[in-house]
Amino acid sequence: MNKAPTTLIIMDGFGLTGPGPGNAVSLAQTPQLDRLFAEYAHTTLSASGLDVGLPAGQMGNSEVGHTNIGGGRVVFQDLPRISRAIDDGSFFENAAYNKAMDDCLEKGSSLHLYGLLSDGGVHSHIQHLYALLQMAKNKGLTRVYVHAFLDGRDVSPTSGRDFVSACRDKCQALGVGKIATVMGRYYAMDRDNRWERVQLAYDAMVYGEGIQNPDPVDAVAQSYANDVTDEFMEPVVCDPEGTISDNDSIIFFNYRPDRAREITRAIVDPGFDGFQREYFPTTYVCNTEYDASMPNVLVAWPRIPVKNGLGEYLSSMGLTQLRIAETEKYAHVTFFFNGGVEKQYPGEDRVLVPSPKVATYDLQPEMSAREVCDKCIERINSGAYDVIILNFANCDMVGHTGVLQAAVKAVETVDECVGRVVEATLKMGGIAMVTADHGNAEVMLQPDGSPMTAHTTNLVPFILCGAGTQLRPGRLADIAPTILDVMGLAAPQEMDGQTLIVK
């Protein structure tokens, strides 16, 4: 017998705010969403700050959003967890950090600290680097090198120079640490197997190959002079003595896993074959668990399990579910949605649609949305699934480029696809929910008119199609209990989210 699915459509990076010259959501032609808002119950959800387990006022992101949606509870995130440990002193007792630093003392080797140098809070926080530098000083380490990955996505595209300058000042004030390399996250933090990019980052950090400039602040200024902003800055070697070698210790201070895996695997995995390189042993600390299969690493902050999240709970009830997205957001509807667990539950099917191979997504704002849409509708029509979780990546990934017209096109593409998926779901007698994990495309311009590439703290929509009811405002953690509610199922006690349906 065909199943009538409950379909959750996540429009990644689609926030709500008033119309304006930089609002790609309001500038776009969105006949499908306009119709859904007019015809069905809808409300707004908080997707940032304390409501998703982040510090107050901190913008949400895809990892956090999907973890909260899938968990059906506010999941305390790595950023406040680590920051709190700095405040209470337990950070400096961390076993993995201590092992890395003690190995340097014992072997007379170097300590390398690398990660995203910004206060964006999505992948890392500069204050965590400063705490590691302080810890290295406390332990009497002298050979300490910082490899700075510039951001330009979660913060202003030209804020990198100030962060590099601040980092250099901090090293000088502490009397420990030198900036050895500087490069854009485009190279060091790829997540799409673009090994030619990762190799440039690797070659700079390990072999000292790349542009040479002893002044890291000037290196960033030179990049700006060439019209290359932080994210895309080519790797620059500032201190040729600061290369990574045998028996050195490395602490990768990013806590978000998805963009930390590739460069980590290149260094720690003897079987790595993404590009030619010699393998050598290091003491390597991943700030969090980047991948359960990663060999030869220590994990500083092991994951706190999210028990009985939506995926696990549906599976335990013998129900079927589909997760579908293109490459850029596949980890989010699987790994993050399942609470940071790679495990695929019984009854859970997954469909990965490759993202287009373009340098930046403003060049193809449609991305692979229509292919995701087509494959999803095929699966809906199969009648095989009780629940379908679907992500459209466009508003977020194109929003990050800062190109307004491309973001408008992205919104319009998502609008078309959402309309088709909702229609297919309702045709099967199912219920469709349309929401987002955080904002982005609704603010494409800074107040001064320059491009805005970061996420926002704006509310996100929630539309319930196919169930005549009244909804209350809520937060992302309330989505899973709402899904269970419309299916006539009680939420497990671990979920502290509440149904959005007004009883």
Model-assigned labels for residue ranges:
Residues 1-503:
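Feature captures the catalytic ectodomains and active-site-proximal regions of enzymes
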